[in-house]
Amino acid sequence: MISYSRDPKEEIPASAVKILGLGGAGSNMLERIALDSIDGAQLISLNTDIRTLSASLSKSKIQLGLNLTKGLGTGGDPELGQQAILEAEAEVRAALKDQKIIFLCVGLGGGTGSGAAPILARIAREEGAFVIVFATMPFLFEGSRRREQAETALNQLAVLSNALVTFDNNRMGELVLAKQGIHEAFGAADKMISESIKAVIRLVVKPGLIHVGLDELITALRTTRSRCLFGSGIADGKDRAAKALRNALSSPLLDQGALLKDAQSVLVHLSGGESLTLFEIELLMQNLQKHVPEHTQILFGAAIDASMGDDLSITLISSLPEEALAS
């Protein structure tokens, strides 16, 4: 079943969207986002390490644990990360006040990310924001302690956030060619997260031909203790609809599309220039229905964006309970 709405619902201003980069890995993700120039959304870097914080491209910065860590890191200790953000809680709350959507980018396993991320998500929810977390998991070679700390934080974030998107660094090889270096691999992962955030902002902030609002996003992600599935693809030229869908389904965040087989609802958003045709929309949706169960509810939206030129993009968002992901 495909649901859509053309009702002129309240538009979310870009000024009511903030993107947070927490800790070292979160700051790296934020750098990619800053380079990609996401219009309107404010970037905030949060860290205990003053050197990393000072080097951040974001205009807004919050130093955590000013008196606790004296400008140093947490040494991989999540308890220090917890104490550090609690020390800065008043400043954090003030920065998140009256926001509609908060994106939290964080690498789990270390002290600041694993310790502070759940508390930061809780504070953002308490301030009334819809919280979407993009979290990366450590490599296996980083050791069992970091992995356990990451899993603990991830389980907490599954409860405290509205949507949780995870990327395991062990799958980084899927993003680049075998001979490319580690720098290119990390860059590709950060780029994927940046594109994901841009797609969600495009989906709920910009007015659409067929509107998708925050309520539809909540419907697609309503399962508690769930992980968000996300895929975004863009293409141009001949057969661009089929190519864009293939690119979205090939995302590691969708496990090459395999995870959609258990989805109960999927939010689909198309965006293209003035050349976007009804035939392309119908073709793309027919192809998508081959990848989801017959009973799946499809929430559909579309927008005309003249700045896209000949490009067509598709965003797929869904969620699965943790037990389905583990099976």
Regions flagged by a language model, labelled:
Residues 1-327:
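Tubulin/FtsZ superfamily GTPase core signature
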